[in-house]
């Protein structure tokens, strides 16, 4: 590739940038492709497409695009910062820090790079260095709510709960109560108040964070979707559905509700010397979206699956294995994908990989639902439209249970149920069960998962960086008087 970059912002690139700002990553990618077809040296198109692919979870492809952008413009701080963000997503702390430091050496007053570096250092437990990054942003520029929010979160994770509440109150007082930063800050404030045992105030803060969202969550539509998967993959028809000839044991899928303990399970398995924890890969979700076109079906998922052929399953299985191998530099025997949405696709995944194993993580429904309600999930994303109301969270909990019980009835040898509370109570016993389920020999490193140098990005990162703890068990009890609609939504579930 020639070294001279094309840096003009074309109309197509302007449209791509607008689509990216609106989180319409697929449209942005198509527009970037249009730019690159017109001029292969368009550094901005390579860069933006790399950012879109990062946001979409296609990390290896994203890295290739960002590296192409760097070939064209080697000392561009914004590209280096994007590469740093990609490495953070992959859990590669050292590579991320290198890229971000390079960006800041080239442009010391680069707030976006300082912000990413601060968040990275926080996740690494280097709280004082992280604080300096955030404060440097505020000293070099006017009030930036993202830096102020990061300071509040830093105080919380450092155990300075009163300071976290104070920082959150200061930020919320100067931001619009409908803004994303206000809502995210309210969740931090609530969690800090919870640690201070000010439970009513904590619940009030979480309600502020969840208030007045106009989401499109439709419980009837959600239940109908579950029904559709259970119909296509009914017990009397599933044996007649085609399967690929792929006999690989490499893909492993962890599924469950958000905040159910899936990150802990992933970290335990990832500490095994023959297991790679790949994080929340979106490859299968993206594949599922494309299947109707690949099958040339007018029906959407899952109805289109009645028309799929074994040769297409072979193709997509091999392609996905190649994507896993691109991440699997250490040639591990198992690669774990913990994208929670995969509970929809257990049937598809079994067709692709008839030998693959699944782990379904379950948690006490009251603890699980409260944990979802008390954390920020973007409710404008389809996956999380239910997270702003306790009754909706309870409803989805029951639907996930219903669908996973169906998959388990169909594939009892392939799906292991892990109870979060049992894992806390006897980590070695439950960890041995999981390792045995994957067909591997026991590795005592699984009990030392908190010593891993892999970066954890999910909301659970502060918890899984230390040994097993039980403070998250029965967390709902001080909030019992606030959980009436949740109890009604959960129906028969025991506490």
Locations of regions flagged by a protein language model:
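Conserved phosphate-donor/acceptor-positioning beta-strand/loop module used by diverse small-molecule
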Residues: 349-372
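Conserved nucleotide-binding/hydrolysis micro-motifs of P-loop NTPases
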Residues: 282-283, 365-368, 423-424
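PAPS-dependent sulfotransferases, especially Golgi type II membrane carbohydrate sulfotransferases
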Residues: 162-172, 176, 185-248, 303-306, ...
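Short beta-strand segments
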Residues: 254-256, 267, 279, 334-339, ...
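Active-site glycine/GP-rich loop and adjacent strand/helix microenvironment
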Residues: 320, 339-342
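Alpha-helical solenoid repeat scaffolds of the TPR/TPR-like class and their adjacent stem/linker regions
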Residues: 1-330
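Long C-terminal interaction/binding lobes of large macromolecular proteins
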Residues: 345
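Short, flexible, mixed-charge acidic loops at enzyme active sites
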Residues: 290-297, 371-379
């Amino acid at each position: 590739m020639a070294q001279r970059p094309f840096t003009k912002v074309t109309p197509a690139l302007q449209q791509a940038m607008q689509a990216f700002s609106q989180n319409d990553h697929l449209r942005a990618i198509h527009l970037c492709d249009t730019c690159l077809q017109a001029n292969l040296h368009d550094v901005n198109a390579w860069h933006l497409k790399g950012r879109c692919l990062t946001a979409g979870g296609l990390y290896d492809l994203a890295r290739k695009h960002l590296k192409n952008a760097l070939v064209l413009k080697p000392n561009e701080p914004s590209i280096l910062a994007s590469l740093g963000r990609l490495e953070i997503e992959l859990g590669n702390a050292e590579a991320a820090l290198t890229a971000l430091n390079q960006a800041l050496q080239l442009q010391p007053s680069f707030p976006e790079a300082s912000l990413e570096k601060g968040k990275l250092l926080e996740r690494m437990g280097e709280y004082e260095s992280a604080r300096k990054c955030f404060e440097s942003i505020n000293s070099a520029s006017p009030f930036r709510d993202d830096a102020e929010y990061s300071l509040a979160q830093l105080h919380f994770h450092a155990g300075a709960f009163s300071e976290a509440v104070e920082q959150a109150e200061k930020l919320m007082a100067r931001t619009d109560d409908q803004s994303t930063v206000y809502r995210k800050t309210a969740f931090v404030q609530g969690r800090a108040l919870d640690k201070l045992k000010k439970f009513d105030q904590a619940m009030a803060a979480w309600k502020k964070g969840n208030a007045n969202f106009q989401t499109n969550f439709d419980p009837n539509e959600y239940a109908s979707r579950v029904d559709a998967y259970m119909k296509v993959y009914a017990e009397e028809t599933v044996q007649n559905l085609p399967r690929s000839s792929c006999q690989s044991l490499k893909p492993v899928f962890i599924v469950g509700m958000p905040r159910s303990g899936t990150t802990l399970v992933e970290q335990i398995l990832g500490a095994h010397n023959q297991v790679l924890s790949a994080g929340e890969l979106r490859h299968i979700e993206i594949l599922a979206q494309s299947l109707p076109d690949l099958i040339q079906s007018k029906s959407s998922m899952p109805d289109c699956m009645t028309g799929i052929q074994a040769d297409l399953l072979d193709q997509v299985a091999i392609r996905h294995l190649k994507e896993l191998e691109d991440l699997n530099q250490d040639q591990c025997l198992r690669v774990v994908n913990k994208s929670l949405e995969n509970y929809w696709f257990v049937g598809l995944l079994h067709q692709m990989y008839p030998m693959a194993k699944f782990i379904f993580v379950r948690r006490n429904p009251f603890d699980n639902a409260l944990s979802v309600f008390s954390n920020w999930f973007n409710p404008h994303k389809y996956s999380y439209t239910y997270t702003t109301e306790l009754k909706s969270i309870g409803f989805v909990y029951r639907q996930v249970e219903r669908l996973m019980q169906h998959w388990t009835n169909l594939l009892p040898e392939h799906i292991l149920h892990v109870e979060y509370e049992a894992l806390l109570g006897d980590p070695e016993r439950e960890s041995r069960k999981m390792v045995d389920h994957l067909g591997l020999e026991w590795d005592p490193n699984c009990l030392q998962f908190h010593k891993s140098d892999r970066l954890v990005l999910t909301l659970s990162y502060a918890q899984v960086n230390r040994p097993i703890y039980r403070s998250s068990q029965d967390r709902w009890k001080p909030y019992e008087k606030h959980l009436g609609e949740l109890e009604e939504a959960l129906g028969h579930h025991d506490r």
